[in-house]
């Protein structure tokens, strides 16, 4: 009888131990993405059209498309950002574009979609960034060369349907500095 009681107790405990084991990995939301309704985004777009202090920022972290971090995605930028300057090239949806593209386009389809999302949904303007440096280009160091360089930059903005150009003036001895700027 005592032996049957031990077997019964062992079987009873084993049943709970086996049924209590859960080997399935259960996804757990640690931090859910903020979601807003269309009214919020409409108000945001309308606010950005008003006369207000502008929030401008440079952004270069969008080249790691597989990252789970929102800090590496356009969608992670603050809603209050009015203008963002592209410091890592221009995201493109065209696989023919490579990093050495004449217009500095880069094939980054996810970043391209996210960039268009913040433009259309959040009303954030996106501008191309370049440092005024004509000496390292094929443009001649003349007034005509400066004009050709300006046309090149304008074509780059227009070709990629961007909202403008961020010309960075960083004095470092290039011909397109000082009196020629």
Where are these regions (language model features)?
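Chitinase-like catalytic core of GlcNAc-active glycosidases
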Residues: 51-181
């Amino acid at each position: 009888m005592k032996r049957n009681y031990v077997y019964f107790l062992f079987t009873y405990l084993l049943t709970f131990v086996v049924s209590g084991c859960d080997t399935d990995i259960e996804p757990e939301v640690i931090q859910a993405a903020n979601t807003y309704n269309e009214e919020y985004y409409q108000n945001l777009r309308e606010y950005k059209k008003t006369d207000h202090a502008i929030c401008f920022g440079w952004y270069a972290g969008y080249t790691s498309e597989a990252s789970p971090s929102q800090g590496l995605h356009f969608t992670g930028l603050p809603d209050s950002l009015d203008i963002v300057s592209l410091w890592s090239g221009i995201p493109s949806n065209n696989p023919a574009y490579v990093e050495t593209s004449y217009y500095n386009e880069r094939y980054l389809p996810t970043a391209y979609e996210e960039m268009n999302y913040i433009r259309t949904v959040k009303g954030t303007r996106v501008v191309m960034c370049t440092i005024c440096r004509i000496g390292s280009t094929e443009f001649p160091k003349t007034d005509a060369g400066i004009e050709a360089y300006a046309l090149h930059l304008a074509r780059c903005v227009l070709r990629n349907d961007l909202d403008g150009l961020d010309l960075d003036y960083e004095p470092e001895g290039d011909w397109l500095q000082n009196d020629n700027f």
